[in-house]
Amino acid sequence: NNDQIDGFIVQLPLPKHINENKILLAINPDKDVDGFHPTNFGKMALNMKTFIPATPYGIIELLKRYKINTQGKHTVVIGRSHIVGRPISILMNSKGEVGDSTVTVAHSRTKNIESYIKKADIVISALGIPGFVKKNMIKKVL
């Protein structure tokens, strides 16, 4: 509640001995510039104005700048972390300039994950495993 501090970021993930939820709940939602506080996350889920986590925000900006139409498309998000996977899946499904997409969330335990990826119009890999998605897994575009 220090008026001299405008905002701050809790660098996630935290070490295992630190209770991440306890830390996130201690954040003043008005100063949570990463959008991880449950209040801000809830606002994002309701498509209300709030801070958006940095990486999902960057993905949305890339889609805008490259004029990639997402409306009515099938998006597969690989990863379900509250840092990238869940927020981007919410944003891609929300109404807006970038969004209005049908979203499937896959993860490391999804059986036959390749079959989901091959059906997708847009694939967002947030699994944290470099090179996980291979060229032959992507749907061919005519």
What residue spans do the PLM features occupy?
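Glycine-rich phosphate/diphosphate-binding loop of Rossmann-like nucleotide-binding domains
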Residues: 49-141
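An N-terminal-biased, well-structured beta-alpha scaffold segment characteristic
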Residues: 1-4
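Cationic, amphipathic, low-complexity alpha-helical segments enriched
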Residues: 8, 141-142
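Anion-binding alpha/beta catalytic cores of soluble intermediary-metabolism enzymes, centered on
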Residues: 9-75, 113-116
